[in-house]
Amino acid sequence: MATNFLVHEKIWFDKFKYDDAERKFYEQMNGPVAGSSRQENGASVILRDIARARENIQKSLAGSAGPGASSGPSGDHSELVTRIASLEVENQSLRGVVQDLQQAVSKLEARLSALEKSSPAHRATTPQTQHVSPMRQVEPPSRKAATATEDDEDDDIDLFGSDEEEDKEAARLREERLRQYAEKKAKKPALVAKSSILLDVKPWDDETDMAQLEACVRSVQLDGLVWGSSKLVPVGYGIRKLQIQCVVECRWGRPLERSHQVEEHVQSVDIAAFNKI
């Protein structure tokens, strides 16, 4: 009962909360104003810098136009005159250098012509060296006489004499060597060239039995003929041709043209490829 009277008392216990909220509100309201003031201060600094730069530009323009502006076109004319004078001086110096070079070249040409004229006379005045042959040993007369007699004795001998016994022996040796050569050549096997041929065997029509056709082709047996692999290649309209490989010795022509066993099945035989082995 002692605390019930406080219910009827009108006291604001949460006033500090509202005070804090009001303070924060006014702080937020005043915040942008301070930022804008700082922005205005920065803008004023930039404007001052721009004004200072303009003043410097105007001063520099005034300084460059001060002494030169009074001269005007006469200053430019004087500068051109000085440049032309310097170019003329340089031209004169270059002409002098060119003249010196021309004189040096003319002197060199004169010297070369003089050397060319004097070169034959110089060659004529040079002493000619005599060619001295090497010394030869002189043999004594006794040795010369001995060699002369020996040469006469050698001349008496007939190296190409026709002795019957020597002729028979030479003929026998020649015949023996020819016989040995013939035997050696006969023992050596003769090399026979071989060729690899790819044949195109075409049937009469699409009803031809290709297996029987291939059997007929392989039935052809000749010396030096070896049949290889084969395959069927379509030609058109249901007709197929037989491609067969064979190795033959180069002693006869087409093997199938000589055979009459395959005429019932084979229309034609063509050589598709030919290679030497």
Swiss-Prot record:
Residues 149-168 have a biased composition (Acidic residues). SMART domains: EF-1_beta_acid, EF1_GNE. The modification N6-acetyllysine is found at K17, K107, K117. Pfam families: EF-1_beta_acid (PF10587), EF1_GNE (PF00736). The modification N-acetylalanine is found at A2. The modification Phosphoserine is found at S37, S44, S60, S86, S106, S119, S133, S162. The keyword Iron does not apply. GO terms for molecular function: guanyl-nucleotide exchange factor activity; translation elongation factor activity. Gene3D superfamilies: 3.30.70.60. GO terms for cellular component: cytosol; eukaryotic translation elongation factor 1 complex. The modification N6-succinyllysine is found at K117. Keywords: Acetylation, Elongation factor, Phosphoprotein, Protein biosynthesis. The modification Phosphothreonine is found at T129, T147. Residues 113-171 are annotated as: Disordered. EF-1-beta and EF-1-delta stimulate the exchange of GDP bound to EF-1-alpha to GTP. Belongs to the EF-1-beta/EF-1-delta family. EF-1 is composed of 4 subunits: alpha, beta, delta, and gamma. This is Elongation factor 1-delta.
